[in-house]
């Protein structure tokens, strides 16, 4: 369908999703770059009675609960601890004159109904 900015805001994602549902009756999925926007998309889909695959990023508590309840398809959790650890490792190596890799991979965690309980507090 396309890409539109919702400026990281739940209400803008909701109105964008409402517009898309109206324009594209065959819409199947909405992928959001944060969970606030995924929750806005979810609110729009539920208000319209539309069953969509909706995925967000961040693993915020209400999104995780929506995943557990079967309302949100998934959330992708960035590993902030892993990112911080990699930065510290690189800084230490640079500080002592060691060579560092040009790229580090810190895996993301896909949170679905199968593993959401591991992330809920």
Residue ranges and their predicted role:
Residues 1-121:
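A residue-level marker of the well-folded mature domains of exported/periplasmic proteins
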């Amino acid at each position: 369908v396309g890409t539109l900015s919702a400026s990281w805001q739940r209400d803008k994602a909701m109105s964008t999703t409402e517009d898309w549902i109206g324009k594209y009756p065959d819409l199947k999925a909405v992928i959001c770059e944060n969970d606030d926007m995924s929750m806005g998309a979810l609110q729009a889909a539920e208000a319209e009675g539309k069953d969509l695959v909706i995925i967000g990023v961040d693993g915020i508590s209400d999104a995780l609960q929506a995943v557990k309840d079967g309302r949100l398809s998934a959330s992708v959790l960035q590993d902030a601890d892993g990112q911080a650890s990699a930065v510290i490792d690189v800084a230490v190596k640079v500080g002592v004159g060691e060579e560092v890799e040009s790229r580090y991979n810190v895996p993301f965690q896909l949170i679905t109904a199968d593993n959401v309980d591991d992330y809920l507090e």
